[in-house]
Amino acid sequence: MSRLFDAGAPVHFDNWTASFVDGAGGKSVLASMWPLLSPLSGSIVVTLDEVARAIRLVAERAHVIAEGAAGCAVAAATTGRAGKGKVVAVVSGGNIDLARFLSLVGTGP
């Protein structure tokens, strides 16, 4: 998303690679989606490691299986990049392969 806002228009990402955050990324954004996205004020960039830690945190503390895209919001909040003060992270969806989820959260404390 940050690259879209920098470009000011939909762009194609040649170097995109798939990850467990499949609901929040892809090779491009549909042109029909740009009018819905363009009014947003910006985006927050988080790493895959930060998202994985956020998914584990949600599983441990809230007992919720969160997919990668939902983990992005929690990662932004827990890293402090979402701003100061109280932050609400909406965690929706559990569309993640169970084996992948287990590999992210681990099996031990």
State each model region's role.
Residues 1-109:
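PLP-dependent amino-acid enzyme catalytic core
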